[in-house]
């Protein structure tokens, strides 16, 4: 009897094979040749520290058991670090102490060896954790260098499901679909978190169904600064323009559509004059009141 994936046998006795990866995910795993490492970065100040603390590592590793079944050479590593905003309440809670000293105090309270902690600055050459808001994140890396990220989500399920994990792994095999979000006309932002913006479905790392967590890449494009849309853009996202495009910008979009590009358009009430010149190109128009 062994607990090492390479030495284990598996048999799924469930009627619907719910303890086994789907056929599509199995195909992805077969293509991922060579070594693979999943590195989990955990902030000592993060409320999710206990998800992958040293005493919880075995349980955490078990979350990937369906994947190690098909690729037993997967290695899992854990990096513990510290970082917090300069206006954090921790500075009031621990007066006259710097961030490192506070981290050591918190580590001791959590029965964690503070000597194992690194600062986010020390890790910056390998990963910019600021882009993850210093929250829990995993980096999946192949021996050939390709990388993908896995995050926890602010919902009831919390952990990524097979859908999100396989979507991340697939990004290391094929060029992900790239979405270009048009800017420059007071469109709804795909990065800001305001009520009127679209970051939740586009780039929010903690939202399970955001584009970046479902296998897409997204970049912003200002057509005023361009002569053509890059060839690696597959989809254009135009999110409720408030000012009209120039003839040059219209021509750029026309060429994109002629080469077979796709477009996702959202238009708000009362924007017919702004949106219809663009929509006419594809045989559509917004009617009054729509």
Model-based region annotation:
Residues 1-290:
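Short, surface-exposed patches at the edges or C-terminal ends of soluble domains, predominantly
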């Amino acid at each position: 009897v062994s607990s090492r994936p390479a030495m284990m046998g598996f048999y799924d006795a469930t009627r619907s094979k719910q303890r086994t990866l789907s056929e599509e995910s199995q195909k992805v795993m077969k293509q991922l040749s060579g070594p693979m490492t999943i590195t989990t970065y955990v902030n000592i100040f993060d409320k999710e520290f206990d998800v992958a603390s040293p005493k919880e590592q075995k349980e955490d590793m078990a979350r990937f058991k369906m994947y190690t079944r098909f690729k037993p050479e997967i290695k899992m590593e854990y990096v513990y670090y510290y970082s917090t905003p300069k206006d954090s309440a921790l500075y009031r809670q621990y007066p006259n102490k710097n961030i490192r000293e506070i981290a050591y105090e918190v580590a001791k309270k959590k029965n964690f060896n503070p000597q194992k902690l690194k600062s986010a600055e020390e890790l910056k050459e390998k990963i910019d954790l600021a882009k993850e808001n210093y929250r829990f994140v995993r980096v999946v890396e192949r021996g050939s260098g390709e990388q993908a990220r896995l995050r926890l989500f602010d919902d009831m399920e919390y952990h990524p499901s097979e859908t999100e994990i396989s979507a991340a792994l697939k990004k290391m095999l094929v060029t992900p679909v790239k979405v270009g979000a048009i800017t420059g006309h007071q469109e709804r932002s795909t990065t800001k978190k305001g009520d009127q913006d679209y970051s939740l479905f586009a780039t929010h790392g903690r939202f399970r169904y955001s584009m970046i967590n479902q296998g897409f890449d997204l970049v912003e494009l200002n057509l005023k600064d361009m002569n053509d849309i890059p060839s690696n853009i597959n989809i254009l996202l135009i999110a409720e323009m408030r000012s009209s495009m120039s003839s040059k910008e219209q021509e750029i979009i026309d060429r994109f559509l002629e080469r077979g590009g796709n477009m996702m358009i959202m238009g708000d009430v009362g924007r017919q004059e702004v949106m219809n010149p663009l929509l006419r190109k594809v045989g559509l128009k917004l009617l009054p009141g729509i």
